[in-house]
Structures are given as C-alpha cells and as structure tokens.
C-alpha cells in the first residue's frame, strides 16, 4: 500500500460544476481573491482579464501567447505572480485572457498542478492538497 501526505483538506461541494477552490493572486502589493476551477486538462493557469487589471498588471509588459483548443483559439497575456490556494503558495507565470468577455479562472498543470500534491475523492467531494516538496 502507498501513502501520500497532505497538509490541507478541502470540501469543494458536489452541487457545483467542476472542482472550485479559493485562490489569492498577488502581484507586488496588490492582491485579489477569487474562485478557480482545477483543470487537469489545461496546460496553463488562465484567469479573467479584469483580475490582471485589479493586480495592476500591464499587458504591454506581458508575454502574449496564442492558445488553441479543440473548437476555438484565444490570446492571453502572461505575467509572473504569486498564487495561493488553501495555504499553498507558489510563484508562477499565469495568463489573463485578452478578451474581457471570457469569464473563466482555471488552475492548470504548468505553474500550479506541477507544484502541488493533489488527491481527490470525488464521491465525498473532498480534495487533499500539499506543496510538492513537503516531506
């Protein structure tokens, strides 16, 4: 039998679509609180455009990236910021949608999932989380 240790347990509620968690994004002295969906199929972390504005991030100083999905494509601006989820904090490049009409916040593999240990028991709507480097 295998054992994995976690530092946090979170009940995410089975009545909602997807697995949503509380997130704090921070850039310099600015921070915003939001809910984001964990998406193991998403390569990157991508957030609503208005959150980048609230953090004081300037698209002129960002890395522009074009994303392609099965049925669409979109552009997003990348910035290095701090992400905190349930007490687990990391610094990562995350993206904000260039199109302000896209209303999604997603925690993806690169920059978040690759930095944590994540366990799910969906039957119980329970998530287990720890920083990856926890011994």
PLM feature spans:
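Pepsin/retropepsin-fold aspartyl endopeptidases
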Residues: 1-135
């Amino acid at each position: 039998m295998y054992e994995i240790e976690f530092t946090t347990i979170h009940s995410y509620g089975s009545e909602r679509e997807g697995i949503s968690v509380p997130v704090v994004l921070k850039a310099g002295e600015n921070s915003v609180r939001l809910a984001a969906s964990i998406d193991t199929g998403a390569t990157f972390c991508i957030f609503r455009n208005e959150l980048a504005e609230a953090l004081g991030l300037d698209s002129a100083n960002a890395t522009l990236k074009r994303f392609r999905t099965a049925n669409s494509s979109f552009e997003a601006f990348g910035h290095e910021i701090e992400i905190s989820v349930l007490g687990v904090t990391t610094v990562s490049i995350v993206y904000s949608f260039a199109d302000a009409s896209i209303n999604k916040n997603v925690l993806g593999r690169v920059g978040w999932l690759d930095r944590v240990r994540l366990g799910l028991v969906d039957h119980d709507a329970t998530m287990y989380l720890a920083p990856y480097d926890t011994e």
